[in-house]
């Protein structure tokens, strides 16, 4: 289905500006730029560290919670915490982005509103998978809060014979359950199942 199909939008004034992106693929366009990152999950942390290391003029994280996400990869968390504590990456906790302008953004927190210089907003707010292809193929989806596709965990095969799934889609809307590091064996399970069934 592709994981990066339907972004969770901010639904704030200015989100339609060209400087607002919901997907990150490289740091070079952000060199010597003032970057704002919305979110505190693995993607937001990775983007903050990458843009900081590749020469962004400033990196500011806007985080709704009191701290960095609890599900951050354990080998990355100390790095982002240290960068924030040292001031190399700024973090506005218990805050939200309320408006995006051409050259600035407005952040709201319990202390009021603050307008800061900004060149790009990277909204790492997550995505919803597109279930259309699965539904067209007849794959059943659990009727729970995460809308997890039904599949055999040992083969990765869905309820439809010959239709397999792998990666992030296996977690449905719980998109932080599976990532590259912990889903590498999905393809091996699929190949093994296909090999057994074709011999």
Language-model features: where?
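FAD-binding core/adjacent interface of flavoenzyme oxidoreductases
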Residues: 1-33, 108-112, 117-125, 129, ...
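Glycine-rich, phosphate-binding/catalytic loops in enzymes
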Residues: 13-17, 54, 138-142, 182-184
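Residue-level marker of positions within ordered structural domains that often coincide
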Residues: 2, 85, 102, 139, ...
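A Rossmann-like FAD-binding core segment of flavoenzymes
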Residues: 53-146
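Short glycine-rich loop/turn motifs that provide flexible caps or phosphate-binding loops at active sites
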Residues: 1, 38-40, 125, 137, ...
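Internal, well-ordered alpha-helical segments in soluble enzyme and binding-protein domains
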Residues: 16, 43-47, 76
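Rossmann-like dinucleotide/flavin-binding elements
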Residues: 22-67, 114, 133, 154-199
């Amino acid at each position: 289905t592709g994981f990066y199909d339907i972004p969770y939008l901010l639904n704030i004034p200015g989100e339609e500006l060209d400087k607002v992106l919901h997907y990150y693929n490289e740091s070079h366009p952000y060199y010597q730029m003032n970057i704002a990152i919305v979110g505190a999950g693995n993607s937001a942390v990775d983007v903050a560290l990458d843009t900081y290391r590749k020469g962004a003029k400033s990196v500011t994280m806007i985080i709704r919670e009191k701290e960095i996400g609890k599900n951050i990869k354990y080998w990355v968390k100390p790095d982002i915490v240290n960068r924030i504590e040292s001031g190399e990456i700024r973090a506005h906790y218990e805050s939200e982005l309320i408006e995006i302008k051409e050259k600035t953004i407005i952040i709201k927190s319990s202390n009021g509103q603050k307008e800061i210089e900004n060149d790009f907003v990277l909204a790492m707010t997550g995505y919803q998978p597109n279930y259309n292809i699965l539904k067209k193929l007849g794959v059943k989806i659990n009727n729970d809060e995460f809308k997890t596709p039904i599949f055999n965990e040992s083969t990765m095969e869905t309820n439809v014979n010959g239709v397999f799934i792998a990666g992030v889609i296996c977690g449905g809307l719980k998109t932080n359950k599976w990532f590259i590091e912990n889903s590498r064996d999905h393809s091996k399970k699929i190949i093994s199942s296909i090999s057994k069934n074709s011999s």
